[in-house]
């Protein structure tokens, strides 16, 4: 007698996420700093309304539990394409992608923007370790819990270092890499890790200051009016208003930071190396060096852009990522 035949339906082509977040009267999540109300950039305001927190299990050092981790989730999760996962620069947040994220969605790419542990807008009142290993482990647990498929991992500046570090440890989680103005050859935080904590906290307070952030912004962008630079500076330091930020930054500084130069030659994933024509922070020569050391890479330059082309020239960045994802570029 024949056994019963079970017919298994194929997976649905897409899954639609339900977004649940408590918002204030202006639509901003209540966990964001009140200074969000002062931001003028309409792209930042729109993207801020989509920031959510999702529980990510984490076991590092003496920390055991779940971190309510801030990110921007795609409205629809596809099952037949690699998702695009956006990291951010050093000491920044997912709002860095305010001008690029909506264009990636328009290009029909499933896109996540994730706040690296210790930065962004997560709930870290019970502070876990925020060293490089913890940041890597947190990203892996988020990927394993929610994304679950090899991803196109995109990292600008120090975010490229985070991406290389992650890929070297969890190659199975990555389909392709996009490294934008990569700061991949820095040797950690150097002698900062030897500072007494009192001095480290003083340095972190300086890092948070508006004048220093404004100066960094002026260097980062090719050309933007002062009023725009001021607003963008406020966007870039918004996460610094989180109550745990100083402790997380000091923990990262004294941990030694990232040192991934020795991993680069072992990365064999297809990689798009992107450099900007007018980057005043990271030399284009480092992008060429990266191209030469990676086993499977191509290089493209973004015209009329400084260190953050995904803010200044988002259409060009989206075209590069879209073509790279579809195989047209490589």
UniProtKB/Swiss-Prot annotation:
EC number: 3.1.1.-
Inactivation phenotype: Stong decrease of tocopherol (vitamin E) content in seeds.
Annotated TM spans: none
Entry annotation: catalytic residues: 157 (nucleophile), 279 (charge relay system), 307 (charge relay system)
Annotated AB hydrolase-1 domain residues: 84-315
Main location: plastid
Pfam families: Abhydrolase_6 (PF12697)
GO cellular component: chloroplast envelope
Subcellular localization: Plastid, Chloroplast envelope
Source organism, top-level taxon: Eukaryota
Endpoints of the signal sequence: none
Key words, A-Z: Chloroplast, Hydrolase, Plastid
Keyword Cytoplasm part of the UniProt annotation: no
GO-annotated molecular function: hydrolase activity
Described function: Hydrolase involved in tocopherol (vitamin E) biosynthesis. Releases prenyl alcohols from chlorophyll biosynthetic intermediates, which are then converted to the corresponding diphosphates for tocopherol biosynthesis. Provides most of the phytol from chlorophyll for tocopherol biosynthesis in seeds.
Stated family: Belongs to the AB hydrolase superfamily.
Protein name, UniProt field: Alpha/beta hydrolase domain-containing protein VTE7
Organism: Arabidopsis thaliana (Mouse-ear cress)
């Amino acid at each position: 007698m024949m056994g019963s035949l079970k017919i298994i339906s194929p997976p649905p082509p897409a899954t639609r996420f339900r977004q649940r977040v408590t918002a204030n009267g202006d639509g901003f999540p209540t966990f964001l700093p009140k200074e969000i109300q002062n931001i003028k950039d309409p792209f930042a305001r729109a993207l801020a309304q989509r920031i959510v927190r999702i529980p990510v299990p984490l076991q590092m050092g003496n920390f055991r539990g779940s971190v309510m981790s801030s990110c921007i989730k795609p409205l629809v999760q596809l099952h037949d394409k690699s998702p695009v996962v956006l990291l951010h620069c050093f000491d920044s947040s997912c709002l860095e992608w305010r001008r690029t994220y909506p264009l990636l969605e328009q290009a029909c790419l499933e896109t996540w923007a994730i706040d690296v542990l210790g930065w962004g807008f997560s709930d870290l009142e019970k502070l876990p370790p925020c060293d490089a290993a913890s940041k890597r482990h947190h990203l892996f647990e988020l990927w394993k819990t929610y994304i679950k498929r090899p991803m196109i991992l995109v990292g600008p500046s120090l975010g490229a270092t985070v991406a290389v570090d992650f890929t070297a440890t969890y190659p199975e989680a990555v389909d392709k890499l996009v490294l934008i103005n990569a700061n991949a050859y820095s040797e950690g935080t150097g002698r900062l890790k030897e500072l007494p904590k009192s001095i480290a906290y003083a340095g972190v307070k300086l890092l948070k200051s508006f004048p220093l952030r404004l100066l960094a912004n002026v260097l980062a962008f090719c050309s933007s009016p002062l009023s725009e630079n001021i607003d963008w500076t406020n966007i870039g330091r918004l996460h610094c208003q989180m109550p745990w930020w100083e402790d997380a930054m000091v923990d990262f500084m004294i941990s030694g930071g990232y040192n991934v130069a020795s991993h680069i030659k072992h990365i064999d994933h297809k990689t798009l190396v992107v450099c900007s024509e007018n980057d005043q922070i990271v030399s284009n020569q480092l992008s060429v060096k990266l191209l030469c050391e990676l086993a499977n890479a191509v290089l493209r330059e973004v015209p009329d852009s400084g260190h953050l082309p995904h803010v200044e020239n988002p259409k060009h960045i989206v075209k590069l990522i879209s073509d790279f994802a579809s195989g047209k570029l490589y």
